């Protein structure tokens, strides 16, 4: 059963300007692994904006926004085929654990001007999710 959805759209230029104005912008919002990914992609702003939108959409799907945790408590990764995965820690994980065994689904895309992400938080009707714990959740 779907118990939360979230979507976010970000202007890539807005993210680019934030990076230019705030030297610590990347380090404040992204994990070491995410930053390594950005570096491997030559710090292209569309990838940064996509992960930013993904974190926002996950926070919305959890139903709290960022009131109980920070951006770095949500890490966006990908599997070997490029499918986006979500790894939660800290307050984000505590919030998600209240739902029991859960699964987060995530889609990220971008064009020239915008990046968008859509997240779904799923549990079964008993508050449990039957999927493996290695698929980008918990």
Swiss-Prot record:
Q: What class of enzyme is it?
A: transferase
Q: Which domain of life is it from?
A: Bacteria
Any Pfam family hit:
ACPS
Provide the primary localization: cytoplasm
List this protein's GO terms for biological process: fatty acid biosynthetic process
Enzyme nomenclature, EC number = 2.7.8.7
Describe the reaction catalysed, as an equation: apo-[ACP] + CoA = holo-[ACP] + adenosine 3',5'-bisphosphate + H(+)
The UniProt entry's GO CC annotations, sorted and at most eight, read:
cytoplasm
Q: Which cofactor does it need?
A: Mg(2+)
Query: Which keywords does UniProt give here?
Result: Cytoplasm, Fatty acid biosynthesis, Fatty acid metabolism, Lipid biosynthesis, Lipid metabolism, Magnesium, Metal-binding, Transferase
Q: Does the keyword Lipid metabolism apply?
A: yes
Give the stretches traversing the membrane. Answer: none
Q: Where on this chain does Mg(2+) bind?
A: 8, 56
Listed InterPro entries = 4-PPantetheinyl_Trfase_dom (IPR008278), 4-PPantetheinyl_Trfase_dom_sf (IPR037143), ACPS (IPR002582), Ppantetheine-prot_Trfase_dom (IPR004568)
Q: A GO molecular function for this record?
A: holo-[acyl-carrier-protein] synthase activity
Localization of this protein: Cytoplasm
Is the keyword Signal in the record? no
| Annotated family | Belongs to the P-Pant transferase superfamily. AcpS family.
Q: What does it do?
A: Transfers the 4'-phosphopantetheine moiety from coenzyme A to a Ser of acyl-carrier-protein.
Q: Which NCBIfam families match?
A: acpS (TIGR00516), pantethn_trn (TIGR00556)
> What is the name listed in the Swiss-Prot or TrEMBL entry for this protein?
Holo-[acyl-carrier-protein] synthase
Source organism of the structure: Clostridium novyi (strain NT)
């Amino acid at each position: 059963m779907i118990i939360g959805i979230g979507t976010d759209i970000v202007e890539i230029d807005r993210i680019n300007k934030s990076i230019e104005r705030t030297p610590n912008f990347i380090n404040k919002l992204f994990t070491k692994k995410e930053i390594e990914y950005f570096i491997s992609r030559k710090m292209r702003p569309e990838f940064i904006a996509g992960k930013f939108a993904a974190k926002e959409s996950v926070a919305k799907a959890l139903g709290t926004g960022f009131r109980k945790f920070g951006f770095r408590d949500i890490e966006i990764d990908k599997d070997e085929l490029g499918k986006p995965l979500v790894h939660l820690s800290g307050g984000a994980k505590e919030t998600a654990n209240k739902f029991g065994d859960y699964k987060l689904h995530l889609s990220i895309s971008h064009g020239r001007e915008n990046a968008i992400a859509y997240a779904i938080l799923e549990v079964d009707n008993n508050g449990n999710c039957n999927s493996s714990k290695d698929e980008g959740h918990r």
